[in-house]
Amino acid sequence: WIMGHMVNAIYQIDEFVDLGANSIEVDVSFDDNAKPEYTYHGIPCDCRRWCTKWEYFNDFLKALRKATTPGDSKYHEKLVLVVFDLKTNSLYNYQAYDAGKKLAENLLQHYWNNGNNGGRAYIVLSIPNLAHYQLITGFKETLKNKGHPELMDKVGHDFSGNDNIDQVEKAYKKAGVTGHVWQSDGITNCIASFIRGLDRAKKAVKNRDSSNGYINKVYYWTVDKYATTREALDIGVDGIMTNYPDVIANVLNESAYKEKFRLATYDDNPWEAFKN
């Protein structure tokens, strides 16, 4: 999965997919009442990027639905996965359940079209704080209460805080999550990747490949350089988040990688660990 980073303006959906992304990451900011408000990152953000592009969240969802609904004039067949980077650090821990509830209501209405031929992309809810695990509970229970528990088949999870992998597993146990887990690892592109290294990403890959691990997929962020892309592919990640999808696409076409990797399509299950 080539994951376009910080796609917060509607026009950027086309831009990133045209550059080679089959997945996008969208920042979601919340108001004081835990309601998703804007697709907005804010300052600071990655180097060589504008941090302040934004849309109203529900407007973005409607555009995203069009981009992922077969037959629509704005449809992109290859856009199959959307990561919502949920900026919940502005919220108190007790608001996490409410944030999940309101997020589910917004997605149900504006993205899934109340279960009637809505957008088809798989969705990953990425939470920065392990203490906010109840967001998952609120999201899941709301879909169930609204009569659409089946939509959870399209939803996966990520804790993005680079916490110890054992601690992440405990948070999932508290939330009752037993699958559909993506594990992110990484650092802003402003800091050279060799300073952080790939040790934690390697641990995540090892967990994914073990018989009793909780992780289904591993992605690494934010990768803009050819050398770092190769390093991430060499340890066996499933996804790379990038500001330059064309860089990742070019590396995937190199002889060392094109036999081993290919771009994921809608038919590839994002909740299943890939077995060679």
Curated annotation (Swiss-Prot):
Keyword Transmembrane helix assigned: no
GO biological process: killing of cells of another organism; lipid catabolic process
GO cellular component, one term: extracellular region
UniProt-annotated binding residues for Mg(2+): 25, 27, 85
Glycosylation: residue positions: 253
Cysteine-cysteine disulfides: 45-51, 47-190
Record's subcellular location: Secreted
Main location per the UniProt record: secreted
Tissue expression pattern: Expressed by the venom gland.
Keywords assigned: Cytolysis, Dermonecrotic toxin, Disulfide bond, Glycoprotein, Hemolysis, Lipid degradation, Lipid metabolism, Lyase, Magnesium, Metal-binding, Secreted, Toxin
Origin superkingdom: Eukaryota
Cofactors, names only: Mg(2+)
Active site: 5, 41
Family statement: Belongs to the arthropod phospholipase D family. Class II subfamily.
Function: Dermonecrotic toxins cleave the phosphodiester linkage between the phosphate and headgroup of certain phospholipids (sphingolipid and lysolipid substrates), forming an alcohol (often choline) and a cyclic phosphate. This toxin acts on sphingomyelin (SM). It may also act on ceramide phosphoethanolamine (CPE), lysophosphatidylcholine (LPC) and lysophosphatidylethanolamine (LPE), but not on lysophosphatidylserine (LPS), and lysophosphatidylglycerol (LPG). It acts by transphosphatidylation, releasing exclusively cyclic phosphate products as second products.
Protein name: Dermonecrotic toxin LarSicTox-alphaIB2c
Organism field: Loxosceles arizonica (Arizona brown spider)
Organism classification: Eukaryota, Metazoa, Ecdysozoa, Arthropoda, Chelicerata
